[in-house]
């Protein structure tokens, strides 16, 4: 019986190291490829756009004693970014069809700065277009405002020159 208890103890101790591992159990903060919708007032077309954003998990801590002030929490932030341009088709005369979009080059876990970041959680908002047309959901024909993945605009690498 002692042999069995010793074997069980060894087994628990050997697997306990995996639970206390420094390796992240969730994807770490890093640039992630996503498709966002780009639109502009005066341009009738909403265009899907391939870009990179910062996403992933950062380690955090919570105080056990509620009487102490909360600890500052880190979030996945942009570290380095570049700007690319997307040209929207069909814009009205006098409307600049070029929209500049940030693309994440590198990311880091840091305190959230409300001056340039949205520090809140995800909302129940669509990342699609405001001007999308609705169509009967039973139809097999896709809406005319949707673009097939083969027609997605790739960013034209355009440096943004400070003025």
From Swiss-Prot:
Q: GO molecular-function annotation terms?
A: hormone activity
Could you say which residues form the signal peptide?
Answer: 1-20
* Cysteine pairs bridged by disulfides in the record: 29-76, 43-91, 46-129, 54-107, 58-109, 112-119
Top-rank taxon: Eukaryota
Q: How does it assemble?
A: Heterodimer of a common alpha chain and a unique beta chain which confers biological specificity to thyrotropin, lutropin, follitropin and gonadotropin.
Kindly name one Pfam family recorded for this protein. Cys_knot
Which positions are tagged coiled coil? none
UniProt source species: Saimiri boliviensis boliviensis (Bolivian squirrel monkey)
Task performed by this protein: Stimulates the ovaries to synthesize the steroids that are essential for the maintenance of pregnancy.
Q: Where is this region: Disordered?
A: 135-163
Is Repeat one of the keywords UniProt gives this record? Answer: no
Positions annotated as glycosylated? 50, 124, 139, 145, 150
Which InterPro entries does the UniProt entry name for this protein?
Cystine-knot_cytokine, Glyco_hormone_CN, Gonadotropin_bsu, Gonadotropin_bsu_CS
Does the record bear Disulfide bond in its keywords?
yes
Point to the regions of Polar residues compositional bias. 135-151
Descriptive protein name = Choriogonadotropin subunit beta
Provide one Gene Ontology cellular component.
cytoplasm
* Gene name tied to this protein: CGB
Question: What processes in GO biological process is this protein linked to?
Answer: G protein-coupled receptor signaling pathway
Family note: Belongs to the glycoprotein hormones subunit beta family.
Q: What is its main location?
A: secreted
List where in the cell it is found.
Answer: Secreted
User: Keyword set for this entry?
Assistant: Disulfide bond, Glycoprotein, Hormone, Secreted, Signal
């Amino acid at each position: 019986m002692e042999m069995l208890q010793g074997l069980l103890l060894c087994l628990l101790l050997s697997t306990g190291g995996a639970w206390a591992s420094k390796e992240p159990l969730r994807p770490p903060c890093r640039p992630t490829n996503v498709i966002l919708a780009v639109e502009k007032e005066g341009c009738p077309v909403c265009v899907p756009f391939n870009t990179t954003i910062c996403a992933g998990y950062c380690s955090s801590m919570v105080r056990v004693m509620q009487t102490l002030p909360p600890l500052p929490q880190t979030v996945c932030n942009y570290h380095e970014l570049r700007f690319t341009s997307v040209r929207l088709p069909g814009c009205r005369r006098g409307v600049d069809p070029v929209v500049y979009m940030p693309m994440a080059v590198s990311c880091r876990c840091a305190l959230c700065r409300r001056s340039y970041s949205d520090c809140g959680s995800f909302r129940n908002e669509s990342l699609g277009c405001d001007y999308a047309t609705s169509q009967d959901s039973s139809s097999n024909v896709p809406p005319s405002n949707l673009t097939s993945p083969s027609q997605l605009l790739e960013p034209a690498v355009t440096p943004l020159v400070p003025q």
